[in-house]
């Protein structure tokens, strides 16, 4: 992957694949599937500046599995891969195993 470094408090997220089947075994076609709201953090910016001008580091890091809002982020294509760029505040939480 091309080296891409987000600025400020922005985060690059790769969507994780959604379910292809319902609980009853019905296969959902791609056109009817909702976009997943879960993804893996690929890269993070250095952080936002506070009122004193100091950089405040982000709470998420590359490799974290996160949940975000349905309409969060801007879709971009880097090296042919569909990714999302969003602010850290668009992330609702980190999923832990």
Swiss-Prot record:
Q: Which GO terms describe its biological process?
A: chaperone cofactor-dependent protein refolding
Q: Give one Pfam family, short name only.
A: Cpn10
Supply one GO CC term from the record. cytoplasm
GO MF annotation list: ATP binding; metal ion binding; protein folding chaperone; protein-folding chaperone binding; unfolded protein binding
**What top-level branch of life does the organism fall under?**
Bacteria
Q: Describe the task this protein carries out.
A: Together with the chaperonin GroEL, plays an essential role in assisting protein folding. The GroEL-GroES system forms a nano-cage that allows encapsulation of the non-native substrate proteins and provides a physical environment optimized to promote and accelerate protein folding. GroES binds to the apical surface of the GroEL ring, thereby capping the opening of the GroEL channel.
Write the protein's name.
Co-chaperonin GroES
**Originating species:** Acetobacter pasteurianus (strain NBRC 105184 / IFO 3283-01)
């Amino acid at each position: 992957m091309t080296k891409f470094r987000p600025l400020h408090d922005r985060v690059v997220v790769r969507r994780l694949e959604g379910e292809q089947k319902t609980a009853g075994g019905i296969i959902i076609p791609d056109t009817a599937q909702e976009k997943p709201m879960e993804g893996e953090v690929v890269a993070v910016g250095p952080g936002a500046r506070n009122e004193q001008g100091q950089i405040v580091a982000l709470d998420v890091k590359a490799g974290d599995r996160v949940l975000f809002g349905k309409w969060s982020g801007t879709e971009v294509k880097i090296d042919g891969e569909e990714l999302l760029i969003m602010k850290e505040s668009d992330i609702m939480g980190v999923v832990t195993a």
